[in-house]
C-alpha cells in the first residue's frame, strides 16, 4: 500500500459543524488503531513513512489513521479562528475515534503526536473525563512537552499564518526548507515529498479559502500520477487564521496552560515514549528530564543532528516508534 485512503468525519461546533479529513493506512478491519497527529502548520501526510513502517511491523494487522487537523489539508476551516486551540482539536480526535470504533470496534488505541499533535495527545491520554471508547494504550510524544521554550514559540510565531504563493513545487519546497532545516538531514527527494502535501493549487481553493478537493486526491497532486508536478500557482494548505490564538496568547495564559498540561501529563497512565531532537529549541533537556521522572515517566529517545522536530522519515526514527509500540 503506497497511498492511503482519504475519509471525512463530521465534527460538532457552534456554526453547524465542520468536516475533518483523515488518511488511513493498513487494514480497515483491524482492531488496533494507531492515531498519528501532526504539528501546528503541518498535515496528516507527514506520517507517510512512519505509517508504512507501522503497517509493515504489524504484519498489516493495524489501522494507522492520520487526520488533517481542522484548518489544515483537506479539512474545513473554522468560521471563528479563536477556536483553533488544543482543547477544540482534542474534541475532534474523540469524534474521530468514535467514528473508527463504530466502523470496526477498537480494542487497542495507540497515539503518536508531533509538536501540537503531542499536546493534543496529552489531553486525549491524560483527561480522565473524555468519552473515548477505549483508553490510550501507548503514547508517543514527538519533541514537545508541557513546558515550551518562549524563544522557540517566538520563532514559530514569525512565520505561522504568513501565507505564501509559489510558482512551482520546488520553489515551495525551498521556501519551507529555509524555515524548517531544524527537521534534520533530508535528501532533496525526501524533502520534496514532504513538501508536496504542504501546498495546494490556487485553482482548487473553495469560496471560503479552504481546500475542497476530490476524495482521492492530495493537496498538491492532480488526478493521475501522484508524482506529477502540480500546476502553479501554489498556496500553503492551511488557514492563515490558525495563527490568531497563537499570537493573542499572553504570558498569564501561557503560565496557566503550562500548569494544565503538567496536570494532564501527571495523570497519564499509558506507557509513554518521548522522542526529542537533540538540538530542539522547543523542548529543553530539563523538560525532557522532568518528563522522565514524573507522570508516566517517559522513556526518552534523542536523535542527534535534529532540532524541532523529527519527521520519522529517517528509518532509525521510525524504528524507535515501532519498537515501542510492538516490542
Model regions and ranges:
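Conserved hydrolase catalytic core segment
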Residues: 106-150
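Active-site glycine-rich loops that stabilize anionic/oxyanionic intermediates
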Residues: 39-42
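Catalytic histidine-centered segment of alpha/beta-hydrolase-like enzymes
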Residues: 306-315
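Active-site loop/oxyanion-hole signature of alpha/beta-hydrolase fold enzymes
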Residues: 14-15, 49, 55, 63-112, ...
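Conserved serine/cysteine hydrolase catalytic core
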Residues: 200-293, 302
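Alpha/beta-hydrolase fold catalytic core
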Residues: 1-35, 56-63, 102-105, 316, ...
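Helix-rich cap/lid subdomain of alpha/beta-hydrolase
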Residues: 144-238
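Short beta-to-alpha linker loops that shape the active-site pocket of alpha/beta-hydrolase fold enzymes
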Residues: 68-73, 145, 304-307
Amino acid at each position: 500500500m503506497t497511498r492511503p485512503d482519504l475519509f471525512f468525519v463530521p465534527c460538532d461546533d457552534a456554526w453547524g459543524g465542520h468536516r475533518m479529513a483523515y488518511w488511513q493506512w493498513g487494514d480497515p478491519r483491524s482492531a488496533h488503531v494507531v492515531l498519528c497527529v501532526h504539528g501546528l502548520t503541518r498535515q496528516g501526510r507527514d506520517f507517510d513513512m512512519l505509517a508504512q513502517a507501522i503497517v509493515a511491523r504489524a504484519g498489516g494487522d493495524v489501522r494507522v489513521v492520520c487526520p488533517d487537523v481542522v484548518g489544515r489539508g483537506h479539512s474545513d476551516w473554522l468560521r471563528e479562528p479563536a477556536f483553533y486551540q488544543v482543547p477544540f482539536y482534542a474534541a475532534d480526535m474523540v469524534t474521530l475515534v468514535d467514528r473508527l470504533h463504530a466502523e470496526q470496534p477498537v480494542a487497542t488505541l495507540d497515539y503518536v503526536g508531533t509538536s501540537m499533535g503531542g499536546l493534543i495527545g496529552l489531553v486525549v491520554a491524560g483527561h480522565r473525563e473524555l468519552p473515548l471508547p477505549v483508553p490510550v494504550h501507548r503514547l508517543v510524544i514527538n519533541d514537545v512537552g508541557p513546558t515550551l521554550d518562549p524563544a522557540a514559540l517566538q520563532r514559530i510565531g514569525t512565520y505561522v499564518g504568513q501565507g505564501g504563493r509559489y510558482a512551482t513545487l520546488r520553489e515551495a519546497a525551498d521556501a519551507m526548507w529555509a524555515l524548517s532545516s531544524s527537521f534534520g538531514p533530508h535528501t532533496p527527494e525526501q524533502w520534496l515529498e514532504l513538501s508536496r502535501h504542504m501546498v495546494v493549487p490556487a485553482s482548487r481553493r473553495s469560496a471560503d479559502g479552504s481546500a475542497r478537493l476530490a476524495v482521492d486526491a492530495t493537496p498538491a497532486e492532480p488526478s493521475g500520477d501522484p508524482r506529477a508536478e502540480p500546476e502553479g500557482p501554489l498556496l500553503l494548505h492551511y488557514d492563515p487564521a490558525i495563527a490568531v490564538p497563537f499570537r493573542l496568547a499572553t504570558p498569564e495564559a501561557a503560565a496557566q496552560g503550562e500548569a494544565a498540561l503538567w496536570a494532564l501529563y501527571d495523570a497519564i497512565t499509558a506507557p509513554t515514549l518521548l522522542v526529542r531532537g537533540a538540538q530542539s529549541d522547543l523542548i529543553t533537556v530539563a523538560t525532557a528530564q522532568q518528563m522522565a521522572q514524573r507522570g508516566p515517566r517517559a522513556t526518552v529517545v534523542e536523535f542527534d543532528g535534529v532540532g524541532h522536530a523529527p519527521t520519522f522519515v529517517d528509518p532509525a526514527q521510525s524504528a524507535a516508534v515501532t519498537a515501542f509500540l510492538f516490542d
